[in-house]
């Protein structure tokens, strides 16, 4: 009997992507984050759908509707906190996934990498518009400050900002359109993720050594399905622990105060996952310069395949590059911490130094390390 899994048009596609997919036999747990991101996305879409059933995108009722979800809707509190903390888990997985690709040279799959960077941008945009929806103080002022950055664009800046706002300030029109964006973007992310996977399956997965593994492949199922299930269970455990024991740990107390355009919070800051970029933005004294630095902090990822100088793909056997990679991780964490601190003497200077180091590492030091290691191979 012919196996339906291999003949049915739809089943065949699923089979080739998740069941009989030839996979390197030596990929480590760092390769789990792709499936975890898929799981996060599905969880966010489902919890978001249930929240949208009770939420009202209107300035007068938005804050109350979120309170209503938490107090009056059956299990509304857990749906709301799973959604909020699910976003944090999403970004932890995203940064781990990008870090893995940087370390093991997966960025040499250029189409996959470029779509991945576009995905990162889209997820960041989704998280930003989503943060505005509860209409608390930090929602309102975060939206005001970040959208206002576009006014730094010469000539069209002010017009562009007012066009995005739908008026002369962040108001009802802004909230309504942000809700519309927040609803549609996850489905765009879903489509992009499918394309990301399509390009990845054209080449097959990379592995920790960075050496082609065509002579040693194993089927994805059962080996990696079971491994992914373990990863998923650990992710769900972490998410549930965070949600049930410390749901507001990563949140902002200011967001429990309804939005008030007449009172500015003492320290406006985004969610933790944007703090590194926010620190880079604040490090530049010039407004347009800051906006460009902010954009470049993520866009720089697109240039990484062009900056690869080493004859080896992975950093597994490259100690100099490893040193600079971990320095970059430490710098990323430093920037994240600086972004949460007030704009005053020691933090400002540390932030500026960390921002310079961030770009210096990616653009100069890591490519140089690759060249030195090439020389050492001959020596």
Curated annotation (Swiss-Prot):
UniProt-listed InterPro entries: Cyt_b/b6_C, Cyt_b/b6_C_sf, Cyt_b/b6_N, Cytb/b6-like_sf, Cytochrome_b, Cytochrome_b_C_euk/bac, Cytochrome_b_N_euk/bac, Di-haem_cyt_TM
Cofactor note as given: Binds 2 heme b groups non-covalently.
As for membrane topology, the entry says: Multi-pass membrane protein
SUPFAM superfamilies in the cross-refs: a domain/subunit of cytochrome bc1 complex (Ubiquinol-cytochrome c reductase) (SSF81648), Transmembrane di-heme cytochromes (SSF81342)
The record's section on PROSITE patterns has: CYTB_CTER (PS51003), CYTB_NTER (PS51002)
GO CC annotations on file: mitochondrial inner membrane; respiratory chain complex III
- Further facts: Heme 1 (or BL or b562) is low-potential and absorbs at about 562 nm, and heme 2 (or BH or b566) is high-potential and absorbs at about 566 nm.
Known function: Component of the ubiquinol-cytochrome c reductase complex (complex III or cytochrome b-c1 complex) that is part of the mitochondrial respiratory chain. The b-c1 complex mediates electron transfer from ubiquinol to cytochrome c. Contributes to the generation of a proton gradient across the mitochondrial membrane that is then used for ATP synthesis.
Q: Which family does it belong to?
A: Belongs to the cytochrome b family.
The identity of this protein, by name, is Cytochrome b
The protein's organism comes out as Berardius bairdii
